[in-house]
Amino acid sequence: MVDSGPIVSLRDVRRDYALGAERVHALQGVSLDVERGDYVAIVGPSGCGKSTLLNLIGVIDQPTSGTVTIAGKRVDAMSDREATSFRLHNIGFVFQRFYLMPILSALENVTLPMAEAKLRREERDARAAELLAYVGLSSRERHRPSELSGGEQQRVAIARALANHPALLLADEPTGELDARTGTEIISLFQRLNSDGTTIVVVTHDEDLAKAARHNVHMRDGRIVAA
């Protein structure tokens, strides 16, 4: 049975860090729901807690208190092994930097998450080719990152993030290292992904990317101030 509730649900989440003798309150009582099929941009000034929130949604970090439920599963107290497996099969990540393996081709980079998930070589290659075609890089699948433009590298990174059919795509400043024209192309790709059913949560300072999302969540000083 498919869970019909929100794909992301946070309740009264706090995240504190020790900074020397001081405690930094990165998130202060955050509650948030993201519905399946939604496209949400988290916006706000630097240091307001956007990336900390995204790390909790992505099960990269755990809250100091509160609950985090992703795709119907409580994730706020998972072991490292459980969190790694959950991320591999449920969450795709896109970052400001592309983090592609320089010695591998575009196609080989896209196959990496599938290899970790133990898919057969033939399945991996077919899925990677399909994804590279989706992002407009069929003719570049044998090229290494050094032979690709920044926009092309980000498209490879997006294809890689989709490799294991994730329930949720998370992106942290995905247009941050791209020029305006290339950034616009990536924004259009995210809109197409969402139109095709992908649930997306992005953290961004890019006003155009935020405007393209269906909903904006505004943060300040570790709190959601508008949603």
Predicted regions and their residues:
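ABC family nucleotide-binding domain
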Residues: G5-M219
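Conserved switch/coupling elements of ABC/ABC-like ATPase nucleotide-binding domains
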Residues: D221-A227
